[in-house]
């Protein structure tokens, strides 16, 4: 995560802070619903540690847990559960009470992956194009109903709605044929194209709405092909990605050797991959900014906004924008969404960048 400031240029206003986070997802996003919970899962999550919405909430300054508290304090705002398909969510939204702070809250809606998992139960092994297209269209209709209900009846104005991932890339479907994987991947691509069109329609027809669309489809592709760039390991067996539970590891402890894997079980990411999902989303909705620069005697004061809490940062700089190496001018602990840092002023002109390297610590 990187923010830029060119010395002497205009500074930027900070985005208004959100007041709450409400989540409507499937098993990947749940913090309270794991029918297989036990020693190999972190509380009632379907992973070995915190899930992405918890990390995002922390980065947004909306609450975080200590390591000793396995129960997320904001779980009452999390309406996610395993196998919550979009049709279920249409009904569940009706039972969701309108929040008093709806206009300033963030709403996460991510159930399109669940729809494809459901299709693998209801449609697969058929590759009838009409059947799959009808399923996609029904999911899109459901998502439109979800958006409009949240907007009109619940007062939501800011939504996070990620693209669907290629579910054939998860270990659950390692054994299906390459031809079938290609067919289903194309159906996901078709859905995502129509999904983006749907979100654009909502943006143009619902005044004041903002919808962020994290591209988790491309992210999963990139993580699988270059896991090391994200601090992860793509564990393989016979050329297929495997999860911690089905791998050759004998130590399945929550903070053990499997923490660097991409998948914790056959469907769900590890907590470390969850943190990557959160980082990508945080950059999209609240890009870190330098909002003001004050020249002092011997130093420059940089005021920062949208600092991702829990992800420590660096101020790096150089005297020529195009030439030379970036050097570290200061380090800081990200403890608040708005912070100030002082850097030495050792020349007539400096160009600064904010850098937040990918990092993760259990849980």
Indicate where each model-derived feature is located.
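Conserved active-site regions of diverse hydrolases
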Residues: 1-289
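Short, composition-biased motifs enriched in small/polar/acidic residues
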Residues: 286-363
């Amino acid at each position: 995560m990187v923010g830029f400031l060119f010395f002497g240029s205009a500074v930027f206003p900070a985005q208004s802070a959100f007041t709450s986070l409400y989540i409507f997802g499937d098993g990947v996003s749940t913090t309270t619903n794991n029918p297989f919970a036990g020693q190999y899962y972190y509380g009632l999550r379907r992973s070995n540690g915190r899930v992405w919405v918890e990390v995002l909430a922390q980065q947004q300054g909306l609450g975080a847990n200590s390591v000793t508290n396995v129960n997320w304090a904001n779980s009452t705002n999390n309406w996610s559960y395993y196998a919550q398909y979009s049709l279920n969510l249409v009904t569940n939204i009706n039972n969701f009470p309108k929040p008093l702070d709806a206009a300033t809250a963030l709403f996460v809606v991510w159930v399109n992956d669940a729809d494809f998992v459901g299709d693998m139960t209801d449609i697969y092994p058929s590759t009838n194009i009409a059947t799959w297209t009808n399923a996609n269209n029904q999911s899109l209709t459901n998502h439109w109903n979800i958006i409009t209900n949240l907007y009109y009846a619940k007062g939501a104005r800011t939504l996070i709605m990620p693209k669907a991932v290629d579910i054939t890339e998860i270990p659950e479907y390692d054994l299906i044929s390459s031809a079938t994987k290609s067919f289903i991947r194309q159906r996901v691509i078709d859905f995502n194209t129509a999904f983006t069109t749907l979100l654009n329609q909502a943006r143009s027809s619902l005044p004041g709405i903002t919808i962020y669309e994290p591209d988790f489809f491309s992210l999963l592709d990139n993580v699988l092909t270059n896991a090391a760039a994200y601090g992860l390991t793509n564990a393989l067996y016979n050329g297929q990605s495997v999860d911690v539970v089905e791998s050759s590891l004998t130590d399945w402890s929550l903070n053990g050797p499997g923490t660097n894997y991409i998948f914790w079980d056959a469907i769900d990411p590890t907590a470390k991959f969850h943190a990557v999902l959160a980082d990508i989303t945080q950059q999209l909705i609240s890009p870190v900014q330098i909002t003001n620069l004050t020249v002092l005697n011997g130093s420059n004061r940089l005021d920062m906004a949208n600092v991702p809490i829990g992800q420590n940062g660096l101020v790096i700089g150089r005297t020529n924008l195009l030439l030379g190496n970036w050097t570290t001018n200061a380090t800081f602990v990200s403890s608040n969404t708005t912070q100030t840092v002082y850097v030495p002023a050792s020349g007539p002109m400096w160009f600064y960048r904010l850098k937040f390297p990918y990092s993760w610590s259990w849980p």
